[in-house]
């Protein structure tokens, strides 16, 4: 189900925590295309460009044009739609934890702010490894019969992406954070052994059976839940649940969850994965099987 439709059925001020790995809007796959750009020079797939020859990458072949510049704004506009619903259904001081791309992080933050949320921090997921892509420019220059030692090991592309940002936003509160903690047990974070936790979460990728191309480590999601949730009765919402990792993390930490997934193939994967986890651990009394 599309979360924009599904969230309409959620009561006002009923969600304690939002934790979601949102689409990044960088044309990673069909489900990550959130713009209407039909520029044939763009190596990203638009819903209006269904040709099989249309390559799935997020940069133009021969420079940017005016249509390309609208991509990030259209992504921002899309984010505002679900941010508006989040503001309605979350409680005062509810933490909003959203994975985001470095490229469009600012657009998500602006969408959250423009719908009323406060930005608290940018948390960091520090990886143990990554897949880096950067082309040696000599590979291109030599085809043009240009040879110059100055370009040895000079590259085009991105630096090795060893981290991913996680936006920590919060719904404003009318009294004090202490009141929010006493009323709903939200508004703060949980430290261990008297130590204030860092905003850098070190977690190896370590995903043995990968169900989704952008799947996050289960341990990382559990760590985020245990940092911001201290009540087993908390309801955690994931608007883009993908293969169901957030649901599994909620079950493993004895929390309640609500999730939405618009892609049928991933909904089926998530359903089977969650149901198997519930049955394997004899948790049918607490968690309902997905039909």
Describe each model-derived feature in a short phrase:
Residues 1-279, 285, 291:
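Core catalytic lobe of class I
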């Amino acid at each position: 189900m599309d979360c924009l439709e599904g969230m309409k059925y959620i009561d006002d001020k009923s969600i304690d925590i939002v934790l979601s790995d949102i689409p990044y809007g960088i044309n990673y796959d069909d489900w990550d295309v959130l713009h209407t750009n039909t520029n044939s020079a763009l190596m990203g797939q638009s819903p209006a460009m269904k040709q099989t020859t249309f390559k799935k990458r997020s940069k133009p072949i021969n420079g940017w044009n005016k249509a390309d510049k609208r991509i990030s704004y259209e992504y921002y506009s899309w984010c505002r739609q679900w941010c508006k619903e989040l503001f309605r259904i979350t409680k005062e001081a509810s933490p909003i934890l959203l994975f985001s791309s470095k490229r469009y992080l600012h657009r998500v933050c602006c969408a959250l702010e423009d719908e009323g949320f406060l930005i608290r921090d940018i948390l960091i997921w520090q990886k143990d490894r990554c897949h880096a892509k950067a082309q040696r420019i000599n590979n291109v220059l030599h085809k043009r019969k240009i040879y110059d030692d100055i370009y040895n090991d000079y590259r085009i592309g991105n630096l090795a992406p060893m981290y991913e940002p996680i936006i920590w936003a919060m719904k404003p509160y009318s009294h004090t954070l202490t009141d929010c903690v006493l009323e709903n047990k939200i508004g703060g974070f949980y430290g261990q052994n008297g130590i204030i936790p860092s905003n850098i979460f070190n977690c190896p990728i370590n995903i043995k059976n990968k169900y989704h191309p952008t799947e996050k480590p289960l341990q990382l999601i559990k760590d985020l839940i245990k940092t911001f949730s201290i009540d087993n009765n908390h309801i955690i919402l994931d608007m883009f649940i993908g293969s169901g990792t957030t649901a599994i993390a909620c079950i493993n930490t004895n929390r309640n969850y609500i999730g939405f997934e618009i892609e049928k193939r991933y909904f089926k994967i998530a359903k089977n994965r969650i149901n198997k986890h519930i049955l394997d651990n004899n948790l049918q009394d607490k968690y309902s099987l997905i039909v």
